[in-house]
Amino acid sequence: MFANISISEFDPELAQAIASEDERQEAHIELIASENYCSPAVMEAQGSKLTNKYAEGYPGKRYYGGCEFVDVIEQMAIDRAKELFGADYANVQPHAGSQANSAVYLALLNPGDTVLGMSLAHGGHLTHGAKVSFSGKTYNAVQYGLNAETGEIDYEEVERLALEHKPRMIVAGFSAYSRVVDWQRFRDIADKVGAYLFVDMAHVAGLVAAGVYPNPVQIADVTTTTTHKTLRGPRSGLILAKANEEIEKKLQSAVFPGNQGGPLMHAIAAKAICFKVAMSDDFKAYQKQVVKNAQAMAEVFIARGYDVVSGGTDNHLFLLSLIKQDVTGKDADAWLGAAHITVNKNSVPNDPRSPFVTSGIRIGTPAVTTRGFGETEVRELAGWIADVIDSKGDEKVIADVKAKVEAVCAKFPVYAK
């Protein structure tokens, strides 16, 4: 039997590190676009006894006994995901977004096939063909980017590259793009060259679920997402598709046994909770506020003389170019971190600096909106960020902003004490 000992009793060193992270999350303002706060119910599911159960296979077709209850849980998650996103197929087993993407590649492509995806330097993701990723090492990756003048996807370039290279698959999606993607334009281009259209909507899945961003699921052949970020669920992945029996079979076998072994049943239960929450009116109102907050912040930066890539935002994030300020993203990240404001350095289109230094920062509003920030609070916050950057990291300015951050965090706690 296990002794009923708490972490703090058994491993005080680890307990202190966890407590410090708890404190950081409460006392710092989180603006990393891919981060959010899970509900207590999601965390309860992730910490449940479901973590003990091995369940290789799928509901009704397991390789282990004792799966009668986890079958119910996984089927609930599948059914809710399909209902939420209007999908005909859902696989809730991917451990993460990258694993979901990897399974799609495995299902639809052969090594060496040509893939057309957005360049990491222009707002794409590692798994969209970056040379350092499996997607760029295993496949012949061709990259498209943004229009230099508008900061928006250059669809003419996408079509030109597609006609030239005849990709087997086109990837639409992003990790740092602030405008609405024209999914149908991508579909039309893919159809011209006989390519699969694969959409990675990891960043905007919550917005899509709430109806405040276009839904790609019935346009693309396959769509993937993470379940955290704007969906506010566990750190995990999801694959969706419109009806196509051949593709569905390929996806099933690509996830298991092709790409993974046993699913994480505690995470799947947490996804089921997340999907149920995302069907609520409160969640829809939250997503609308996420976008309003991002737009309000972008307006403040523009008024302060900063360049926002593409001139604004239609979703939960935007890129702030610091080239005009002669400030690196790395420095801005560090200065703001000292003021208890968490962002991430990010390359901007045609960035003259390396990806380890960058000339910009990425700002997202999902987490601060979860805390309860509205336009008033985020406008103040944008002003504080501009103050810190304009001061070039002046210690007095940082200290002043840090005090303001502490006050507003105390007013808007993440979790009730």
Curated annotation (Swiss-Prot):
Residues annotated to bind (6S)-5,6,7,8-tetrahydrofolate: 120, 124-126, 354-356
UniProt-listed CDD domains: SHMT (cd00378)
The UniProt record lists the keyword Cytoplasm: yes
UniProt modified residues of type N6-(pyridoxal phosphate)lysine: 229
Cofactor: pyridoxal 5'-phosphate
Marked site (Plays an important role in substrate specificity) residue numbers: 228
GO biological process, one term: tetrahydrofolate interconversion
One matching Pfam family: SHMT
Enzyme category, top tier: transferase
Signal peptide start-end: none
GO molecular function: glycine hydroxymethyltransferase activity; pyridoxal phosphate binding
Gene3D superfamilies documented for this protein: Aspartate Aminotransferase, domain 1 (3.90.1150.10), Type I PLP-dependent aspartate aminotransferase-like (Major domain) (3.40.640.10)
PANTHER family in the cross-refs: SERINE HYDROXYMETHYLTRANSFERASE
NCBIfam families: PRK00011.1
Subunit structure: Homodimer.
Protein name: Serine hydroxymethyltransferase
Source organism of this protein record: Acinetobacter baumannii (strain SDF)
